[in-house]
UniProtKB/Swiss-Prot annotation:
Pfam families xref list: FA_synthesis (PF02504)
Region (Disordered): 334-366
Similarity comment text for this entry: Belongs to the PlsX family.
Coiled coil: none
Biased composition (Polar residues): 343-366
Native source organism of the sequence: Onion yellows phytoplasma (strain OY-M)
Disulfide feature: none
Protein name per its UniProtKB record: Phosphate acyltransferase
Length: 366
């Protein structure tokens, strides 16, 4: 049984949609046990009126405290309200009471709280936000870093690329995932110093399937399985994608239901295709974004997540835990560190002066 902590009080539609989504996930997967952190007086009635028969899969940890999105100074909040639902969920993961955490709370709040409580994995220099998104070709892609770091070094992006490659192999079941660098042009000479140096690092790594640069207009049609950039750039790309998809679908629906005749025709002819299109492109359908680089699996569900989207986020966490992604990442980082150490030692050995041979030659000449 995989135990996952749920921040029931985080999100725009908490606790109703969070509880409904959790129960939906438990009905879909009997391997999950959830620990719900939040106000029991609100949680229990929601569980009781929702069809559900696996109560042995639920534990409720009562707390009346939760974090509001306006709360900015996490260190102060952690001292003032250590029993807030999010903090308790993360603390449970730290103490190995659960194997992962899912929250729809504010992104920066979750990132900072996770960093303070769970800490980064050994050898991991930065945390990254890595959402998945769908496209017209029914492929799921990974975008990172989508907002954890506005400024990064090439070495950080290189590490993220290796991390995302393992996730694409284990979760998306892509044997040899391709990585591309989000940039303003496809030529290797395009971009800032960050992109230029990262391009060189990725090109030289034989363990990565690097496909070069990718322009933003190809976000939905790229051959890449993983798109890489700093948190500022990737976050803008992600929000542009999300806003475009939601507005497109809403506007398209408005056109097709503008009058009674169109509404009847749409219901008769286009209802099923429209639902398929929504499932294909709606960013809320995919689940959540992974917080990469932490000692435990943490999933950031969309702030506006309703039941189905939150359910997907929980199932996503379960897959990552079951696949032992963190353990494989730790092994990959350790192997890379060992190779780097061996390379430096070999380089030092080759450049060291051959003292004994030099002395012998000097004595012979005398």
């Amino acid at each position: 049984m995989i135990k996952i902590a749920i921040d029931v009080m985080g999100g725009d539609f908490a606790p109703l949609e969070i509880v409904k989504g959790t129960l939906l996930a438990l009905n879909k997967n009997k391997e999950i046990h959830v620990v719900l952190y939040g106000n029991q007086k609100l949680i229990t009635p929601l569980i009781e009126k929702t069809p559900f028969f696996g109560n042995n899969q639920i534990t409720i940890k009562h707390t009346p405290y939760f974090l509001r999105s306006a709360d900015k100074n996490i260190r102060d909040q952690l001292k003032a309200t250590p029993n807030a639902s999010l903090f308790l969920a993360l603390e449970a993961a730290k103490q190995d009471e659960v194997q992962g955490v899912v929250s729809a709370g504010a992104t920066q709040t979750l990132v900072l709280a996770s960093h303070l409580i769970l800490k980064k994995m050994p050898l991991m220099q930065r945390i990254a936000i890595a959402p998945m998104f769908n496209s017209f070709d029914n492929r799921t892609r990974i975008l990172l870093d989508a907002g954890a770091n506005t400024e990064l070094k090439p070495q950080h992006l290189h590490t993220f690329a290796n991390y995302a490659t393992i996730i694409a192999k284990e979760i998306l079941e892509i044997p040899n995932p391709q990585i591309k660098l989000l940039n303003i042009g496809t030529e290797p000479t395009k971009g800032r110093a960050l992109e230029l140096e990262t391009y060189q690092l990725l090109s030289q790594d034989s363990n990565l399937n690097f496909g070069g640069n990718e322009e933003p207009q190809n976000l939905l049609t790229t051959s890449a399985d993983i798109l890489l950039s700093d948190g500022f750039t990737a976050n803008i790309a992600l929000k542009t994608y999300e806003g475009t998809m939601l507005n497109f679908m809403n506007h398209f629906k408005t056109i097709l239901t503008k009058n009674l005749i169109k509404k009847m025709a749409t219901k008769t002819l286009f209802q099923k295709p429209l639902q398929q299109l929504k499932n294909q492109l709606d960013p809320r359908q995919i689940g959540g974004a992974m917080l990469l680089g932490l000692n435990k699996i943490v999933i950031k569900a969309h702030g506006s997540s309703q039941a189905y989207a939150f359910c997907q986020a929980i199932l996503q966490a379960q897959k990552l835990i079951k696949a032992q992604v963190n353990q494989k990442i730790a092994h990959s980082l350790e192997s890379a560190k060992n190779k780097e150490t061996q390379s430096k030692q070999a380089s030092t050995k080759n450049t060291a002066p051959k003292t004994s041979e030099t002395t012998k030659e000097s004595q012979q000449s005398l």
